[in-house]
Amino acid sequence: MATSPQKSPSVPKSPTPKSPPSRKKDDSFLGKLGGTLARRKKAKEVSELQEEGMNAINLPLSPIPFELDPEDTMLEENEVRTMVDPNSRSDPKLQELMKVLIDWINDVLVGERIIVKDLAEDLYDGQVLQKLFEKLESEKLNVAEVTQSEIAQKQKLQTVLEKINETLKLPPRSIKWNVDSVHAKSLVAILHLLVALSQYFRAPIRLPDHVSIQVVVVQKREGILQSRQIQEEITGNTEALSGRHERDAFDTLFDHAPDKLNVVKKTLITFVNKHLNKLNLEVTELETQFADGVYLVLLMGLLEGYFVPLHSFFLTPDSFEQKVLNVSFAFELMQDGGLEKPKPRPEDIVNCDLKSTLRVLYNLFTKYRNVE
């Protein structure tokens, strides 16, 4: 039982001026009223704080704010399933990311007569992922071409994903996809996978920065479906990841002066042909003809006045890896010649990134333009 607080012993006080009786009565009333209001305000604040605390606990598992697909309601007790908030799908940046990735896949697989229209629906069974990886890596995978049953599809998907993970060499916590999530058509998992592939192989595309998806995590508790929402980041600063985050004169040319860009291209074509013509070679397309690294290696030998042994590089590279090795070797020759390490990555050149190729060739032009 609560007890009333005991009164404190009286303490002598200093004399105070006497107030008129009516004013004292008013002060007493207002004091009581003020104390009551203060207590009520404090009680309200405590109540609101308690409610806020309860909401913080309960809201993450609140009733689902939208209608679920019938398949997504078939959960066992305590089973958890994730899905994209339908409202998040209309985000312009997410739409842009999906379009860029779809266009990239279709460009890579143009010779396979494969047209992707929907990432989740077209990639879940592993068929397109297999073809995409084979094309990017120039390696044939030992898997069945056509699979109909779910078991066969998952077996194929397992093989494809294992090979992809082996190539990407990502730490386990960075791998945000698996057989079950991809086969379940998880857009989040498939996007993470495609972004990782495009960045590893230095795809000649520009991914939008800071794309996030609102993900709804659904769980069945005591027979009731409850949910919580989390923000899943798909892309961060893609410029920094690609190694092209520092703007230079070529960024300005591409963005604001296409006419001057054409002049630069013609100047560089004239420069490289002046030397490559000595080997009866000629360049007309800068972005494509330097992509395998062969012309870069030969050009460095001509500029520095030495013969590059043919066993030092791949004269007819037939895989992405061999092309990257060629370009890397050419970069080493440039550094041996006194140039700084090129800012672009070898993969950028192999993927026909024009801006990266121009940067490398312009550095050569600056140093060797007077070489006959």
Swiss-Prot record:
Q: Where is the Calponin-homology (CH) domain?
A: 95-202, 262-369
- Which tissues carry this protein? Widely expressed, with highest levels in heart, skeletal muscle, kidney and liver.
Query: Known consequence of changing S4D?
Result: Loss of interaction with TESK1, however no effect on interaction with ILK
Spell out the GO cellular component terms annotated for this protein, sorted alphabetically and separated by semicolons: actin cytoskeleton; cytoplasm; cytosol; focal adhesion; plasma membrane; Z disc
The record's family statement is: Belongs to the parvin family.
**Function statement:** Plays a role in sarcomere organization and in smooth muscle cell contraction. Required for normal development of the embryonic cardiovascular system, and for normal septation of the heart outflow tract. Plays a role in sprouting angiogenesis and is required for normal adhesion of vascular smooth muscle cells to endothelial cells during blood vessel development. Plays a role in the reorganization of the actin cytoskeleton, formation of lamellipodia and ciliogenesis. Plays a role in the establishment of cell polarity, cell adhesion, cell spreading, and directed cell migration.
Name of the protein this chain belongs to = Alpha-parvin
Q: Which gene encodes it?
A: PARVA
